[in-house]
Each structure stands twice: as C-alpha cells, then as structure tokens.
C-alpha cells in the first residue's frame, strides 16, 4: 500500500487555508435583503450574518405586535438570503472542493 506524499498533503492543506481566507473576504462583501408585510419592513444583513439595517414604514408603528412580527420575518428572510448567497459564493471560490454547508458551520454561520 502506497503512503500518501507528505508534500502533496501539505500543499492541499495550504490551498484549503488560502481558500478559507478568500471565502472570509467574500462573505464580508456580501449583502442580502429581506422584507415582510409587502415591504413595510425591510432588513439588510451581511454575508457574515450581521444585521446592517432595518427600515420600518412609519405608518405601521401604531400596531406594536404587527411590527414585532414583521421585523422578525424580515430579518429571518434576509438571513436566509444571506446564507444562500454565502453557499453560492463558497461553491464558486472553492470550486466544489469544500461543502458550503459544513464550511459555514465551521465559520459559525448558518444552522
């Protein structure tokens, strides 16, 4: 049984590390949007799953419970869109070398 070439293994590890750094940079640049209530509440999140902005139509501010529900729905929609963008970007950057879902878990993103 042939032993794996240590040099090749080290090169693959180095390439994987470089790909991870590239993925991190790409995730920082990604922006995703979500909305609820027909656009009455809009959320924007980064590729690293951070809420960047939240816009609420002033006309709905009197209905506290509805605002709460719509904010949650809009943020969750934006987070879902962000995960999808991140998975797509990981696939592009790694050329299929890495499983996007597992990589996002390793980066503490996604579920």
Swiss-Prot record:
Disulfide bonds listed in the record: none
Keywords assigned by UniProt, alphabetized: Cytoplasm, DNA-binding
What NCBIfam families does the record tag this protein with? DNA_YbaB_EbfC
Quaternary state and interactors: Homodimer.
According to its UniProt entry, this protein's organism is: Chlorobium chlorochromatii (strain CaD3)
For this protein, the record's PANTHER family field holds:
NUCLEOID-ASSOCIATED PROTEIN YBAB
Q: What does this protein do?
A: Binds to DNA and alters its conformation. May be involved in regulation of gene expression, nucleoid organization and DNA protection.
Q: Where in the cell is it found?
A: Cytoplasm, Nucleoid
Protein family membership: Belongs to the YbaB/EbfC family.
Classification via Pfam families? YbaB_DNA_bd
Decide whether keyword Amino-acid biosynthesis is in the record. no
Name this polypeptide is given: Nucleoid-associated protein Cag_1190
Question: Where the protein is mainly located, per its record?
Answer: cytoplasm
HAMAP family under this entry?
DNA_YbaB_EbfC
An example Gene Ontology molecular-function term: DNA binding
Transmembrane parts of this sequence: none
């Amino acid at each position: 049984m042939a032993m794996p070439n240590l040099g090749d293994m080290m090169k693959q590890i180095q390439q994987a590390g470089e790909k991870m750094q590239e993925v991190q940079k790409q995730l920082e640049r990604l922006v995703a949007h979500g909305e609820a209530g027909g656009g009455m509440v809009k959320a924007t999140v980064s590729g690293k799953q951070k809420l960047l902005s939240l816009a609420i139509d002033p006309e709905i501010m009197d209905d506290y419970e509805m605002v709460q529900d719509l904010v949650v729905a809009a943020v969750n929609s934006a987070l879902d869109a962000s995960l999808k963008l991140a998975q797509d970007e990981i696939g592009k950057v790694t050329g299929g070398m890495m499983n996007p879902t597992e990589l996002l878990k390793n980066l503490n993103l996604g579920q």
